[in-house]
Each structure stands twice: as C-alpha cells, then as structure tokens.
Amino acid sequence: DATSNLDPTISTLVGGGNAFVLADSRTEAGMTEIFGAETLPAAVLYTRDDFIAENPKTTQALVNALYKALRWLETATPEDVVATVPEEYYQGNPAIYAEAVKNSLPTYSRTGLVTEEGEKAAMELLSFDPEIASAKVDLAATFDPTFVEAAGKN
C-alpha cells in the first residue's frame, strides 16, 4: 500500500512505525526532486482582479497579515506554532503537530513571493488535467507581487 499525504498525517504514520517515506515534499531537497522547485505555491491568497480593484486596502491588510505570519515563522519554534492554533488542529497530540511543523517549515516561503520556478512547478503539477495542460496560461499574470512587496516595506 502507498499514500500521498501531508503532515500531520505523515508524521503520525511514520512516528507510529506504520509507514516510511519514499519521497518527502516537506524539505527543500524533496520539493526540488519531486517538483523541480524549492517551494510550491499552494497556501497563497487567492482573489479575483475585480476584488483587488474594488478593495485595495482590504487586500493589502490580508497580505500584510500573511507576510507578518511568515516573518514570525522565521523565529517561532514548532511549539510556538502549536500554541497559536486551535486544539482541533493537533487533535489531542501537540507533539506530533509540532513534529509536523518542524518537518514542513523549511518549505515555507520567507518572502511571500512566488518564484518563476514555483509558478512553472505549480503549472506542471496541475497539468495532469488535460484542460489545464492544453490551456495557454500567462504564468507571469497569475501571481501579483505588488502587495507582498508593499508589505515588506512596512
């Protein structure tokens, strides 16, 4: 049997002796080996152009909050992260959640910016869908760094 999953599921299975890791996307080396990029844009702020145009202050506030969280993660310990999330996140096992955070932190962006290699890797990952694979996508137009760059100046 095999699974493709995220933490804390992987840490729980490995920690319980019920699984071993063949390919690990929780590390930069693993991300590069699997996806061809050190980071993969996944947990990002998704919004439409019309929302941004109508709500630039709200958009900036949301990006500022995410940017501040990324900066906090530079010095936070996994235990600090556990202390900030709802108990339901770690389902009664804060130690395994802390292990999951420790394993995943290296792949988190520290700048909030999406790299060109990350854009390409995301497109390749989603190209299993024939509709996406055949689409003409201007990757440079899918990620707007303007608000992240402004957050970095605050």
Predicted regions and their residues:
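A local structural motif
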Residues: 1, 18, 95, 130-139
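Residue-level signal for threonine
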Residues: 48, 115, 144-148
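Secondary-structure end/capping motifs
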Residues: 52-132
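Pocket-lining segment of extracytoplasmic ligand-binding domains
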Residues: 1-86
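Short, solvent-exposed polar/charged micro-motifs at secondary-structure junctions
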Residues: 32-35, 109-110, 145-152
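Intrinsically disordered, low-complexity regions
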Residues: 17-18, 113, 153
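Conserved C-terminal helix/tail region of periplasmic/extracytoplasmic solute-binding proteins
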Residues: 120-154
